[in-house]
């Protein structure tokens, strides 16, 4: 075996002894066999030190690994995984072969990963006093202590990335990329090349394994939610969120329901 080729993704992460939280995600979600065998996978991982910082401050309010729900574990793991083997440089290529034109890739995440129980207090309110206008959420709010299973976004989850060659193709400056992703340290033209996934910087790339690659990030990758959910939950756009809530309603999705049952049975 060539010297540059490591073991499987699982074995390589476990052997380095600084990705223990990622290893726990793999084991808890039943992916040990998948990540131990040959195949085509790409995984973005954060070191244990990054997880310790994550548990100090995060949007879920969890302070330890043990407090993560199964849904949150799936978001962290599947949202950082691609069902193909990619070195960083190749991630900017489109499916049709065009180079440096892709800004996003389909992740291994699924809508069912984000399904969770919502309490009556968490559900939207149809703010309207117009006569005859329906308040679709009221029937769920009337029963105190009742919760419903729901996903807030039915679109296919994707991973957004900023690759150097991709940015050059679109004539986007490094300083612009740093501003977009919120890198307070900036990115000067004289600095070495970089890559970002959402707002996370790739610190070590293209670790070659028997069944794909993994890339090391500076922070724990938490895929952002939909635009409507970000507006609802960021604390600074509550009034605008109430306007959107007026026109919102719960919809039954038979396919999603069956997928959820299959996942939990």
What spans do the regions from the language model cover?
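Mature, structured domains of secreted/extracytosolic soluble proteins
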Residues: 1-265
């Amino acid at each position: 075996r060539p010297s540059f080729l490591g073991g499987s993704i699982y074995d390589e992460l476990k052997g380095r002894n600084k990705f223990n939280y990622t290893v726990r995600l793999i084991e808890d979600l039943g992916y040990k066999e998948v990540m131990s065998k040959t195949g085509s996978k790409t995984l973005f991982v954060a070191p244990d030190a990054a997880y310790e910082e994550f548990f100090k401050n995060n949007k879920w309010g969890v302070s330890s690994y043990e407090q993560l729900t199964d849904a949150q574990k799936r978001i962290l793991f599947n949202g950082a995984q691609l069902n193909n083997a990619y070195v960083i440089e190749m991630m900017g290529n489109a499916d049709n072969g065009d180079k440096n034109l892709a800004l996003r890739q389909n992740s291994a995440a699924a809508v069912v990963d984000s399904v969770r129980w919502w309490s009556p207090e968490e559900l939207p309110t149809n703010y309207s006093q117009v006569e005859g206008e329906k308040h679709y959420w009221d029937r769920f709010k009337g029963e105190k202590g009742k919760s419903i299973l729901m996903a807030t976004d039915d679109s296919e989850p994707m991973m957004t990335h900023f690759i150097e060659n991709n940015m050059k193709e679109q004539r986007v400056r490094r300083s612009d990329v740093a501003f977009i992703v919120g890198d307070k340290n900036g990115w000067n033209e004289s600095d070495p090349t970089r890559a970002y996934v959402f707002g996370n910087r790739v610190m070590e790339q293209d670790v070659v394994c028997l069944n794909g690659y993994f890339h090391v990030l500076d922070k724990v990758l938490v895929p952002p939610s939909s635009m409507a959910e970000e507006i609802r939950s960021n604390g600074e756009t509550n009034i605008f969120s109430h306007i959107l809530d007026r026109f919102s309603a719960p919809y039954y999705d038979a396919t999603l329901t069956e997928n959820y049952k299959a996942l939990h049975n």
